[in-house]
Design a protein with these regions (language model features):
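Short histidine-centered beta-strand/loop micro-motifs
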Residues: 45-46, 55-60, 77-78, 96-98
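A structural feature that tracks compact, well-ordered secondary-structure segments
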Residues: 69-72, 85, 141
């Protein structure tokens, strides 16, 4: 499956107009923003977990980044309320679930295999910086080599 795979092109997506698509596991739905591959793919998605839902244990061969938009996301490493950014490095694995339900912005398979740092940031209590244009604020989240997430 290929959706918005030309990363050299600028793109604006109104995610509210995209349909929720069921994932392979009950209670977990996705809005696909970008995808290059089938079920295991480089992907950018909005993922919604129903209350008391879970995803089976899996490994992220080229890493995972997510930002919790609503609710509380959980795995065996911790609980992540709305506003939490997490970078799970290449080769990491987890068994995600939620008691209350949650919505995430997720990027998969973008990280350098040599980037081994796990990052967890509470964006709601972090110090944001003035951006390059008036009214823009920026929060650096992760950096490795030439890749930066803010």
């Amino acid at each position: 499956m290929q959706i918005n795979t030309d990363l050299s092109q600028k793109l604006a997506i109104h995610s509210g107009e995209l349909p929720w698509l069921a994932s392979p596991l009950k209670g977990v739905d996705r809005k696909m923003l970008e995808r290059d591959g089938d079920e295991v793919a480089r992907a950018t998605s909005i993922v919604r977990y129903a209350p008391k839902s879970s995803f089976s244990r899996h490994q992220h061969d080229l890493g995972e980044e997510f930002l919790v938009l609503e609710g509380v996301f959980q795995d065996e490493h911790g609980q992540y309320p709305a506003g939490t950014y997490v970078k799970n490095p290449s080769g990491s694995s987890h068994t995600p679930f939620t008691d209350t339900g949650c919505t995430l912005f997720v990027k998969l398979r973008y990280l350098d295999p040599q980037d081994t740092e796990r990052v967890v940031i509470d964006t709601q209590s972090s110090g944001w910086f003035a951006g390059m244009v008036p009214g823009l604020t920026v929060l650096p989240l992760s950096s490795f080599g030439t890749k930066n997430t803010a």
